[in-house]
From Swiss-Prot:
Gene for this chain: queF
NCBIfam families cross-referenced by the UniProt entry: QueF
Protein name per Swiss-Prot or TrEMBL: NADPH-dependent 7-cyano-7-deazaguanine reductase
Active-site annotation: 192 (thioimide intermediate), 199 (proton donor)
Top-rank EC class of the record's enzyme: oxidoreductase
Family designation: Belongs to the GTP cyclohydrolase I family. QueF type 2 subfamily.
Its biological purpose: Catalyzes the NADPH-dependent reduction of 7-cyano-7-deazaguanine (preQ0) to 7-aminomethyl-7-deazaguanine (preQ1).
GO biological process entries: queuosine biosynthetic process; tRNA modification
Organism name: Shewanella denitrificans (strain OS217 / ATCC BAA-1090 / DSM 15013)
Length: 284
C-alpha cells in the first residue's frame, strides 16, 4: 500500500470549494450552499474499493442551529447528524456551516419541518443515507461530557524528532500474544486539507489480535501532526494502516475532533461493532 502519492493535488472536486475563500454569509435558506467532496479521492489512495472492509458513520454535532418559528420568534437547538460511510460524498464542513447559517432568518412551522429539510438537503449533498436528530433546549442536560473508554497511551515518555506522517512506525509493532484491548490518545492532530488549519482530536482504537506496541502506536498517531487531510480520511487511513501493519482480527477506530465554526466531526469505523451513543468530550 502506498502513502506517498498526493491524491488531492489535481482533484477537480476540490477546486470549487468555498473552504479557504472569502465568503459572504447568507441568512435565508439556501441548500445550494452545501458542497460535497467525493470519498473516492482518499479511498483510491489507500486502496479501498467499493467493498469496504468496515462499516460506520460520520457523526456531526452542530451547536449553532437556529431558525424562526411560524411567528418569527427565534428557536435554538443542537443538531446531531449521522452520515453513512457508503455515501458518495462527505460533506465539506465550511459549506455545512454556511448552510446552517442560511436557516437563521427562515421560518419553519414546527420542528419536523426543520428536520425534514435538513435530512433532504444533507442526503442530496452526500448522495447517501443521513439521520438527523434535533435536541431542544429542554433536553440539553443529556449532552453530558464523557471520556473515550480505554487505556490512554499519552503518558508514555518518548522523544520525538520527526513529525512527518509515516505509517512505517507500525512495522514490527506487534507481539505474538493475542489480546483484546482498547487504547486512546488525545494527541491526534492533523491539518485541514485545503486551509492547513489545525484539526485537534482524540482517538479510540479497540482491537482484537496481536498485541500492539503502545510506543510505536503513539509515534504513528503523532506523525499525523503535519499531515493534510480531512477528519474522515484520517480515520480511514488509520484503520487501513492498523489492518495492514498490525493484522488486527477485529478493529474499531473512532475519533472525536474539536469543533470549528460550531460543528464537530466524529468519524467511526469498525468491522465488528456499531457506533456508540454520541457524547461530547471535554475539549468539544
Amino acid at each position: 500500500m502506498t502513502h506517498n502519492h498526493d491524491p488531492y493535488s489535481d482533484a477537480q472536486a476540490l477546486k470549487g470549494l468555498t473552504l479557504g475563500q472569502a465568503t459572504q454569509y447568507q441568512a435565508e435558506y439556501d441548500p445550494s450552499l452545501l458542497q460535497g467532496v467525493p470519498r473516492k479521492l482518499n479511498r483510491d489512495a489507500i486502496e479501498l474499493t467499493t467493498e469496504l472492509p468496515f462499516h460506520g458513520t460520520d457523526i456531526w454535532t452542530g451547536y449553532e442551529l437556529s431558525w424562526l418559528n411560524g411567528k418569527g420568534k427565534p428557536v435554538v437547538a443542537i443538531l446531531q447528524v449521522h452520515l453513512d460511510i457508503h455515501s458518495v460524498n462527505l460533506i465539506e464542513s465550511k459549506s455545512f456551516k454556511l448552510y446552517l447559517n442560511s436557516l437563521n432568518q427562515t421560518r419553519f412551522n414546527n420542528l419536523d419541518a426543520v428536520k425534514d429539510t435538513l435530512t433532504t438537503d444533507l442526503s442530496q449533498c452526500a448522495q447517501g443515507e443521513v439521520t438527523v436528530k434535533i435536541i431542544e433546549p429542554k433536553h440539553f442536560t443529556i449532552e453530558r461530557i464523557s471520556e473515550l473508554p480505554g487505556n490512554c497511551i499519552d503518558d508514555l515518555d518518548i522523544e520525538i524528532f520527526d513529525y512527518q506522517f509515516n505509517p512505517e512506525y507500525l512495522l514490527d509493532s506487534t507481539e505474538e500474544k493475542n489480546v483484546a484491548e482498547t487504547l486512546t490518545s488525545n494527541l491526534l492532530k492533523s491539518n485541514c486539507l485545503i486551509t492547513s488549519q489545525p484539526d485537534w482530536g482524540s482517538v479510540m482504537i479497540r482491537y482484537q489480535g496481536p498485541k500492539i506496541d503502545r510506543e510505536k502506536l503513539l509515534r504513528y498517531l503523532i506523525s499525523f501532526r503535519q499531515h493534510n487531510e480531512f477528519h474522515e480520511q484520517c480515520v480511514e487511513r488509520i484503520f487501513m494502516d492498523l489492518k495492514q501493519y498490525c493484522h488486527c482480527a477485529k478493529l474499531t477506530v473512532y475519533a472525536r475532533y474539536t469543533r470549528r465554526g460550531g460543528l464537530d466531526i466524529n468519524p467511526f469505523r469498525s468491522d465488528f461493532e456499531q457506533a456508540p451513543d454520541s457524547h461530547r468530550l471535554a475539549r468539544q
